[in-house]
UniProtKB/Swiss-Prot annotation:
Interacts with SMXL6, SMXL7 and SMXL8. The interaction with SMXLs occurs in the presence of (2'R) stereoisomers of strigolactones, but not (2'S) stereoisomers. Interacts with MAX2. Forms a complex with MAX2 and SKP1A/ASK1 in presence of strigolactone. InterPro entries: AB_hydrolase_1, AB_hydrolase_fold. Induction: Not regulated by strigolactone, auxin signaling or bud growth status. One of its GO terms (biological process) is secondary shoot formation. One of its GO terms (molecular function) is hydrolase activity. This is Strigolactone esterase D14. The active site is at S97 (nucleophile), D218, H247. Disruption phenotype: Increased shoot branching. Accumulation of carlactone (CL), carlactonoate (CLA), methyl carlactonoate (MeCLA) and of their derivatives, including 3-hydroxycarlactone (3-HO-CL), 4-hydroxycarlactone (4-HO-CL) and 16-hydroxycarlactone (16-HO-CL). Corresponding hydroxycarlactonoates are also observed, such as 3-hydroxycarlactonoate (3-HO-CLA), 4-hydroxycarlactonoate (4-HO-CLA) and 16-hydroxycarlactonoate (16-HO-CLA), as well as methylated derivatives (11R)-hydroxymethyl carlactonoate (1'-HO-MeCLA), 4-hydroxymethyl carlactonoate (4-HO-MeCLA) and 16-hydroxymethyl carlactonoate (16-HO-MeCLA). One of its GO terms (cellular component) is nucleus. Changing G158E: Loss of interaction with MAX2.
């Protein structure tokens, strides 16, 4: 995608008023609508940039190139192309899940663009290693991939409530909706890319101040990961823990998350 058409292809929107720019970047299985409960808290003081990852169900699947999006780097290219197309010089960046990973790499490539990284449900690696607890064994992940491939609908019905964690049926419905919007083959392909990614080796290259936001219990990211990030990220790093459970607090506990985001954003 060229800079010219990426804004249209990835449904880029800029909403709100204010001098400061805030990026809200969604995670796997959702699209920019995942921020709809968060947005009202920030549109009076920020110009908020929203976009859809190329894998999102809200994007024309023809844009998803299976030969290109084999690592996180092309997603980073997309983000930086959006930033450049909009003429943004500096912004605060909120990234959820895979978009937290994307933000990390983008900040290493172009640190001058980012005043603050706020990473929600972020893990540099989901698989366990000898001296690292990512939360998943390789065999467990392969079973997940097999379930997605065998019966995507059944997998979504099982995974959505597990990921949301908190007892918020509306959040489960919303997450299920956006998961179902994804083409199953794209969903599986992206899952493999994310679970095969390992950013541990580059964390020390991050120089942008970072706030890691986790929930009290997240099926995708063990609590120990936040402490790992605190000690391995290269920039000033703080860790905040929400008094809620689940991987999608923007859907299940938006008021609480918005409060934490306000506190974390540069003054």
């Amino acid at each position: 995608m060229s800079q010219h058409n990426i804004l249209e292809a990835l449904n880029v929107r800029v909403v709100g008023t204010g001098d400061r720019i805030l990026f809200l970047a969604h995670g796997f299985g959702t699209d920019q609508s995942a921020w709809h409960l968060i947005l009202p808290y920030f549109t009076q003081n920020y110009r908020v940039v929203l976009y859809d990852l190329v894998c999102a169900g809200s994007v024309n699947p023809d844009y998803f190139d299976f030969n290109r999006y084999t690592t996180l780097d092309p997603y980073v290219d997309d983000l930086l192309n959006i930033v450049d197309s909009l003429g943004i010089q500096n912004c605060a960046y909120v990234g959820h899940s895979v978009s937290a990973m994307i933000g990390i790499i983008a900040s290493i490539r172009r640190p001058e663009l980012f005043s603050k990284l706020i990473l929600i449900g972020f893990s540099p690696r989901f698989l366990n290693d000898e001296d690292y607890h990512g939360g998943f064994e390789e065999g467990e992940i392969e079973k997940v991939f097999s379930a997605m491939e065998a019966n995507y609908e059944a997998w979504v019905h099982g995974f959505a409530p597990l990921a949301v964690g908190a007892d918020v049926p509306a959040a489960v419905r919303e997450f299920s909706r956006t998961l179902f919007n994804m083409r199953p083959d794209i969903s599986l392909f992206v899952s493999r890319t994310v679970f095969n990614s390992d950013l541990r080796g580059v964390l020390g290259l991050v120089r942008v101040p970072t706030c890691v936001i986790q929930t009290a219990k997240d099926v995708s990211v063990p609590a120990s990961v936040a402490e790992y990030l605190r000690s391995h990220l290269g920039g000033d790093t703080t860790v905040e823990t929400l008094k809620t459970e689940g991987h999608l607090p923007q859907l299940s506990a938006p008021a609480q998350l918005a409060q934490f985001l306000r506190r974390a954003l540069p003054r």
